[in-house]
């Protein structure tokens, strides 16, 4: 009986930490994870990367195709993210609505850039039709990536808010792309063919 109770508790804990629709970590778990990663990166003077991404013209997609198809689209994108997760290095979560966050630890800027580009390509390869998009005939994503070694005056939300700014820059650069910034570089929209 005690083993059943422990197993049930583990299932409940797992449900409380994961998004029901996508199976990715939820925002509560993400916040806890990001705080721990930030503290570790600060103490060890290691690079921390935060990426915010969302689906381009997702409201129009939902309005045109319906919420059931919208849910399928979110699950397909989550499937791409589940494939790129690396325990202890690449952590993916649903941030809310059609937004996702990826936390990168123990990696170089080049590795982070490559993974971001891989995500973009994988989403393109899904070829989910999107008649209402103004940037592609398929579902596409925009990504904002910020990576640096945390400084004394930083907090984890500084990384989140900077990634959010970069996401909006990616949208202003035409969407279906990535805007990346580090402590040593200015914001750069990366065009991926």
List each language-model region with its residue ranges.
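Heptad-repeat alpha-helical coiled-coil signal-transmission segments
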Residues: 2-5, 9-12
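Conserved nucleotide-binding and Mg2+-coordinating catalytic segments in signaling enzymes
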Residues: 10-32, 53-67, 75
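Short regulatory alpha-helical coupling segments
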Residues: 11-14, 27-47, 78-87, 105
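Hydrophobic framework residues that shape the active-site pocket
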Residues: 54, 58, 77, 95, ...
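Catalytic-core segments of nucleotide cyclases and related cyclic-nucleotide turnover enzymes
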Residues: 67, 105, 109-117, 131-134, ...
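Active-site-proximal alpha-helical element of nucleotidyl cyclase-like catalytic domains
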Residues: 69-89, 99, 118
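Short catalytic/binding micro-motifs of nucleotide second-messenger systems
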Residues: 83-89, 121-134, 167-169
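A short pre-motif secondary-structure segment
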Residues: 90-94
